[in-house]
């Protein structure tokens, strides 16, 4: 049994979505149940009380979040300047997942999608690191194939693989 916890605590606009009591309950009651927690930088700053701007600060934040009881931590670095590198910590070793910044405003739901893909692949029997690697590949493609809907942050394209299969003739339409 695995639990992937995406602590959705802060909106794209920077507004806190949880009151202090809920954050305390999340840290005390939910994080210790997590096989993996997947905070972004602003969420990790709330969980740790620290400012995160460097790779070293990302590592320290992972240590602090791991100390709250999560088995593993995947700290998503997309909110930092430069390349959107994510950091995985299993309690012993750190692994950076390097990425290239994709110029798009269509990033709504990226964190939820990544954690869901990781959870689904863990349920399929993949190891934690395999699930993270599959999740990273999936979310990168979903962002690359995103499309504009409405105003502001648009969604990623969750069904990009289906569209690619149709174009390649693997699925008859």
Predicted regions and their residues:
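Glycine/small-residue-rich loop that forms an oxyanion/phosphate-binding "nest" at active or ligand-binding sites
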Residues: 1-29
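Short beta-strands and strand-loop turn motifs
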Residues: 4-12, 38-47, 115
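Conserved phosphate/ATP/ADP-binding segment of small-molecule kinases
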Residues: 20-93
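Charged C-terminal helix
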Residues: 129-173
């Amino acid at each position: 049994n695995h639990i992937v916890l995406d602590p959705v605590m802060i909106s794209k606009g920077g507004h806190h979505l949880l009151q202090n009591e809920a954050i305390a309950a999340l840290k005390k009651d939910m994080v210790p149940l997590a096989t993996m927690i997947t905070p972004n930088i602003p969420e990790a700053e709330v969980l740790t009380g620290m400012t995160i701007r460097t790779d070293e600060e990302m590592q320290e934040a992972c240590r602090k979040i791991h100390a709250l009881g999560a088995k593993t931590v995947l700290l998503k670095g997309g909110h930092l300047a430069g390349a959107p590198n994510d950091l995985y910590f299993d309690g012993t070793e750190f692994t950076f997942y390097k990425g290239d910044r994709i110029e798009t405003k269509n990033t709504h739901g990226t964190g939820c999608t990544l954690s869901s893909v990781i959870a689904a692949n863990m349920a399929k029997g993949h190891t934690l690191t395999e699930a993270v690697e599959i999740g990273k590949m999936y979310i990168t493609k979903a962002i690359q194939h995103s499309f504009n809907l409405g105003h502001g942050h648009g969604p990623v394209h969750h069904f990009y693989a289906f569209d690619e299969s149709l174009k390649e003739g693997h699925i008859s339409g």
